[in-house]
């Protein structure tokens, strides 16, 4: 062709040179315009209101919400397991488990690539079972690829320290912490745990477990604060405050108040079984700890596995909306437990399929789903079908986004390895773990003052038992830690008494598969020793999930020692050599033979990474034991209802062929010194129903050692419109006393400590006579008593 012809609105024909010049100018202008648009888009993204850290959180939430698609909104209600957990379990499971098992988080039909894509598409809000900083950062990088760059919440079961992660501090479990009656310590441990979690780029702990544990068969007693509503309430509230701080720094994490409600009081003592309980018992026993933690600012609440009076907790509108939000003013978000919404289909049979179960749960008040592959698609469909309004979805998403802004995750989605290494397992935290362990160990028996040991007298000591030299001492919700980070009982003994010859006979770690030959060997060695230490109890380590005898989903039909442990104790004790039994367990055990025949018994619960040192310090008198039982120790499973705060008629008819009294009562614990309570008096003997009074008692350390006594105040309403407990804990204090020292201790008796739900289910203080009791345990014989008249 000789020329190019262009015609524009009748204009003249231009030459090739003119046209080429025109095209170059046009392309250049277009490129400048495109660059300008791109820069403007980047600039506008950078200056979006929701990304402005100076803007009020409420405005940031609304701005972000307005930009989200329905798919992205539902994604904010979606939690999945971490990629490494997913990959590891998928590879290790059998074909049958892959097809049927939900507990190990295998998602049939999904791959790691699918999870990564969902995350980078903004369809995942949170992950759990992420155990390393590297994976947490990698998941956040995926989230930052999403359109709106909404950061993830990383959740973990940091029940007693962030113990599922390597090199993090492992404190005593909650049942031991409760036995210290040390509320400030609970707060401190939670603060330190929060710091270690944030150093691992984790933001949400599934704790405190504020269920009141009344049944020792239930495997999760160890993660609770015991059987008393008042003690559980104070420990749970302090723990909640400790985790959260002000929820505005990189030292704060979200608490998760769980499990709401009734899981600790199932009909057969098994996890997830039905709970059938009156509203009166709910409000008097099980609700107070939840209410206090919620009103302390608890940011999240987890529902309980079970059905409550026929209605699954995960679809229970009365619990989620009426009680939590309307009565208690809960502003945070509610999360399901491990695929428990789906269990409405295959366990409770209250929904025909998962989609229907999701509908029921969301309409009842659920905000976030833990965990499972079907949630995203099904919930989006429910909205598009008009069965759930978008505004209902917005309610949940607002609550979830609010916490992410509070925690500063939009500004700080990553954490460096340098910051992690500076914080985790630091000297201050390790010192706290050791001190907490010392204060959590209960001395149950000490005939003829066998303890503390005189190292010059007992030069050759046999140490044996499944818990003598095993990391199981850390307790449930722990993963294996480097050996140099954990002090077992054997290590602790050798550390504290290096001049003693300790001979160790290993019984293995598994109580169900103990060797008769090893028991025989230990008995033979016991005959040659000056003294014997037997470390028994239960096995709790989660990496051997199917081998545990205590912990989550590890419930029992009896409370006896498992396997050959009783034989080991009996035969060693029968050698005639002084014998000490050390129990390491997450639940109260029925050690009847030992209680009658073994001269010294220590109940160490699950004392954490320095438990062995703390036990050894008590054995050799470096530390004077002070802990008191946070849970009654029954004689058998038939005595599970012998909690101290029973109703008066509970034992009107005594049992035959046995005893009505427990092995050791709530609040019980010995010391190497003795204490005397005297002169219990009230600041007024008569008060009005809206008035307060003070109860004062004198406590004297009558022994020759310094010590700490846990003074306890109980109250009974003598005559009331409804049947009331024989006593209820309403005050306690840790009292440090030098040998020979006396101190006056004062307890406040306020109207709320006298109030109860009357015959009309109204909380009130009824006029009449109250009995005030103060002493060193809940046992009547240990209590001083006086009367208070309320007009």
For each predicted feature, which ranges?
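Glycoside hydrolase catalytic-domain context in secreted enzymes
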Residues: 17, 39-755, 766-780, 789
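Bacterial Sec-dependent N-terminal signal peptides
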Residues: 1-46
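Extended hydrophobic alpha-helices typical of membrane-associated regions
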Residues: 785-787
């Amino acid at each position: 062709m000789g020329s190019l012809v262009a015609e524009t609105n009748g204009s003249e024909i231009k030459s090739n040179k003119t046209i080429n010049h025109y095209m170059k100018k046009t392309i250049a202008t277009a490129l400048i315009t495109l660059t300008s648009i791109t820069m403007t888009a980047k600039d506008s993204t950078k200056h979006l209101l929701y990304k402005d850290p100076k803007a009020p959180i409420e405005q940031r939430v609304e701005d972000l919400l307005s930009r989200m698609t329905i798919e992205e909104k539902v994604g904010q209600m979606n939690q999945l397991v971490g990629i490494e957990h997913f990959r590891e379990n998928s590879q290790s499971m059998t074909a049958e488990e892959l097809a049927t098992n939900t507990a190990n988080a295998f998602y049939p039909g999904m791959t790691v690539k699918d999870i990564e894509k969902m995350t980078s598409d903004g369809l995942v809000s949170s992950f759990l079972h992420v155990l390393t900083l590297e994976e947490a950062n990698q998941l956040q990088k995926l989230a930052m690829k999403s359109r709106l760059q909404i950061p993830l919440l990383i959740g973990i079961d940091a029940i007693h320290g962030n113990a599922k992660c390597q090199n993090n501090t492992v404190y005593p479990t909650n049942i031991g912490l409760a036995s210290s009656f040390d509320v400030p310590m609970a707060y401190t441990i939670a603060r330190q745990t929060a710091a270690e979690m944030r150093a691992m780029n984790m933001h949400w702990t599934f704790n405190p477990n504020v269920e009141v544990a009344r049944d020792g068969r239930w495997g999760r007693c160890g993660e609770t604060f015991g059987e008393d509503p008042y003690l559980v309430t104070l420990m749970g509230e302090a723990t909640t405050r400790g985790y959260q701080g002000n929820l505005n720094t990189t030292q704060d994490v979200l608490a998760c108040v769980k499990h709401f409600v009734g899981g600790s009081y199932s009909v057969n003592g098994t996890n997830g079984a039905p709970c059938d309980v009156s509203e009166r018992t709910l409000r008097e026993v099980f609700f107070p700890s939840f209410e206090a933690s919620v009103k302390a600012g608890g940011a999240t609440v987890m529902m309980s596995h079970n059905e409550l009076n026929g209605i699954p907790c995960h679809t229970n509108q009365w619990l989620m909306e009426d009680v939590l939000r309307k009565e208690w003013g809960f502003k945070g978000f509610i999360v399901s437990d491990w695929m428990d919404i789906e269990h409405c289909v295959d366990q409770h049979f209250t929904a025909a399929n998962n989609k229907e179960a999701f509908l029921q749960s969301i309409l009842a008040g659920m905000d976030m789903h833990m965990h499972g592959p079907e949630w995203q698609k099904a919930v989006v469909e429910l909205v598009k079908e008009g069965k759930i309004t978008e505004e209902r979805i917005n309610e949940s998403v607002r609550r979830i986004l609010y916490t992410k802004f509070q925690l500063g995750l939009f500004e700080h989605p990553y954490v460096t390895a340098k910051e992690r290494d500076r914080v985790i397992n630091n000297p201050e935290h390790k010192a706290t773990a050791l001190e907490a362990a010392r204060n959590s160990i209960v001395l149950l028996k000490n005939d003829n003052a066998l303890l503390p040991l005189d190292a010059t007298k007992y030069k050759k000591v046999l140490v044996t038992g499944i818990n003598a030299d095993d990391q199981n001492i850390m307790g449930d919700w722990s993963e294996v830690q480097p050996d140099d980070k954990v002090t077992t009982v054997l290590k602790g003994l050798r550390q504290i008494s290096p001049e003693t010859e300790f001979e160790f006979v290993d019984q293995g770690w598994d109580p169900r598969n103990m060797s008769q030959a090893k028991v025989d060997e230990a008995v033979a060695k016991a005959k040659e020793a000056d003294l014997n230490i037997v470390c028994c109890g239960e096995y709790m380590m989660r990496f051997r999930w199917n081998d545990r005898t205590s912990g989550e989903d590890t419930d029992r039909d009896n409370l006896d020692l498992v396997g050959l442990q009783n034989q080991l104790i009996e035969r060693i004790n029968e050698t005639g050599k002084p014998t000490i039994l050390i129990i390491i367990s997450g639940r109260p055990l029925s050690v009847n033979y030992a209680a009658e025949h073994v001269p010294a018994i220590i109940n160490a619960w699950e004392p954490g990474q320095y438990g062995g040192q703390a036990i050894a310090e008590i054995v050799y008198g470096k530390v004077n034991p002070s802990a008191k039982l946070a849970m009654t120790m029954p004689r058998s499973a038939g005595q599970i209802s012998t909690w101290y705060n029973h109703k008066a008629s509970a034992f009107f008819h005594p049992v035959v062929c046995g005893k009505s009294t427990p092995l050791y009562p709530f609040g019980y614990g010995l010391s190497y010194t003795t204490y005397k309570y005297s002169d219990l008096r009230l600041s007024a003997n008569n008060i009005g129903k809206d008035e307060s009074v003070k109860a004062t008692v004198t406590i004297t350390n009558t022994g020759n050692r310094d010590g700490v006594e846990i003074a306890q105040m109980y109250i009974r309403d003598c005559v009331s419109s409804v049947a009331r407990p024989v006593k209820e804990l309403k005050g306690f204090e840790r009292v440090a006393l030098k040998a020979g020292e006396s101190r006056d201790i004062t307890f406040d008796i306020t109207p709320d400590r006298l109030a109860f739900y009357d015959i009309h289910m109204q909380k009130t203080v009824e006029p009449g006579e109250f009995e005030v009791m103060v002493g060193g345990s809940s046992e009547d014989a240990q209590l001083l008593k006086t009367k208070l008249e309320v007009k």
